[in-house]
Amino acid sequence: MIASNTSSLPLPRLAEALVEPERFLGLHWFNPAHLIPLVEVVPIERTDPSVVEWSMALLADLGKRPLALSRPVAGFLANRLQYALIREALQLVDDGVATPEQIDSVMTDCLGLRWAVLGPMQSTDLAGVPPAVAVARELFPGLSNADAPQPVLSELLESGRLGVSTGEGFFAYPDPEAVAQTRDRLLSSVLGILAEAKG
């Protein structure tokens, strides 16, 4: 079996160089890989189903939660959802509607907490389909459909503010190593609480 962790390069194109493409698929882990349970399993059209089954079993044995996609799509599932939200967040910052701090607060103090318990689809079921349809009709036409990075992101790139690695992005990071350490510590705590609550 040959697997790629990429979610940005087209898997069918990578498989063109292989003698046995039926043994190839994507196994997309998420950072930090030792903590995030989900791993996307992405077969191409020629992937043998037994390779998918073997990969799913291996990941489960490693304590992961494998999720098999039916076919490759650019970015796979998690990054498509993540970047749909990031695109809207960048637009709100670029339009002066919200600050980066406010965007992150909405996620860490509201949506992230709710979605850690119930995903967006089950949250929709809980709220009810009729209100979801009404809100979608109202909001969808005004959501960002930008097909290129918003200026606020391009300006960070051009100014050399590349994020934690350079000590500054949307925020300043006087101690870059502490950012990942804090993230890992808090993620471990959240995962422990969720595991205990689910029994």
Residue ranges and their predicted role:
Residues 12, 56, 89-90, 105, ...:
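Short glycine-/small-residue-rich flexible loop motifs, especially phosphate/cofactor-binding loops
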Residues 4-80:
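Rossmann-fold dinucleotide-binding core
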Residues 64-67, 95, 100-199:
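NAD(P)-dependent Rossmann-like dehydrogenase/reductase catalytic/cofactor-binding core
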